[in-house]
Amino acid sequence: MVQEQFVKDFNERTGNNVQFIAAEYEPNVFLQMVRQKHLENEPEGGKRCTSCFEMRLDIVAEKALELGFDYFGSALTLSPKKNSQLINEIGLDIQKIYDVNYLPSDFKKNNGYKRSVEMCKEYDVYRQCYCGCIFAAKAQGIDLKEQNREAIKFIRNQS
């Protein structure tokens, strides 16, 4: 897997011990949830996003507990388009369900977003221009076929 090789190369270059845990890519689970809750027409940043944050943080908390981690968190707070306060509130609520703590963050503070762009260039990390949600992509006028071609090209160049 490209991600595993990237992490291995990154660790060798930097002397770090970063680990990568891949979650299943199951967009249909999200789409089912959206349909069940009738969230198809919600605006970006509305109830659909809140439900997505809840779903994703629940998955992360469950995995953190399974692996014996003390904390779980989210890189979603890096995006200038995402509500860090809301994400953190959801994480703090979810920690009550699992025996694992949520680590609140707002990575965009102190030029965090700018620094993330710099680091992605420095370490040759692929960045997409939206959160991954098909609704957000459509709202922003993003050509998903073009995004897919760019991602495939990036992956091939890594091999």
Spans of model-derived segments:
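Nucleotide-activated chemistry modules centered on ATP-dependent adenylation/adenylyltransferase
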Residues: 1-159
